[in-house]
């Protein structure tokens, strides 16, 4: 398989993981109720673990190569602050667009990081694509449940 087709396939799989999570959320009636709650907590924890793994295994080591520790810390905190402000604004607005904006604010940086990893020819692109896919399954799961809950 050519490198271009490999990149297309890996990015497609990472992106399609979100609808897979939504399909899993479609079958949500698990008895007993406590088991359903534990499953939701487990899926959310799995997504958080995948996200932290992507940061620790791929993004931070790549960033350290190009930035000093101080600059990396400032950029990390600035990004965290920007997303906190966005989250506060979205929770205040409480519109139907809030979920879309939240998903896009996650999708765009993921796409940029994945594209940059593959453009640099780094083998970490494959790992990053796998970690993004693992994180997107719980994201799709939770987004489906939130959208369904807000429509009733």
Predicted feature residues:
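Intrinsically disordered, metal-sensing/regulatory segments
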Residues: 1-152
């Amino acid at each position: 398989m050519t490198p271009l087709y490999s990149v297309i396939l890996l990015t497609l799989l990472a992106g399609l993981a979100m609808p897979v999570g939504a399909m899993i959320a479609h079958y949500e009636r698990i008895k007993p109720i406590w088991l359903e709650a534990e499953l939701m907590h487990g899926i959310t924890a799995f997504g958080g673990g995948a996200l932290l793994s992507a940061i620790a295994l791929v993004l931070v080591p790549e960033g350290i190569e190009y930035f000093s520790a101080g600059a990396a810390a400032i950029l990390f905190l600035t990004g965290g602050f920007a997303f906190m402000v966005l989250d506060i604004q979205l929770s205040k607005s409480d519109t139907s667009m809030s979920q879309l904006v939240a998903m896009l604010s996650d999708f765009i940086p993921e796409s940029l990081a994945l594209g940059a990893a593959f453009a640099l020819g780094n083998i970490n692109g494959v790992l990053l694509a796998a970690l993004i896919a693992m994180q997107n399954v719980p994201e799709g799961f939770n987004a489906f449940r939130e959208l369904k809950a807000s429509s009733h």
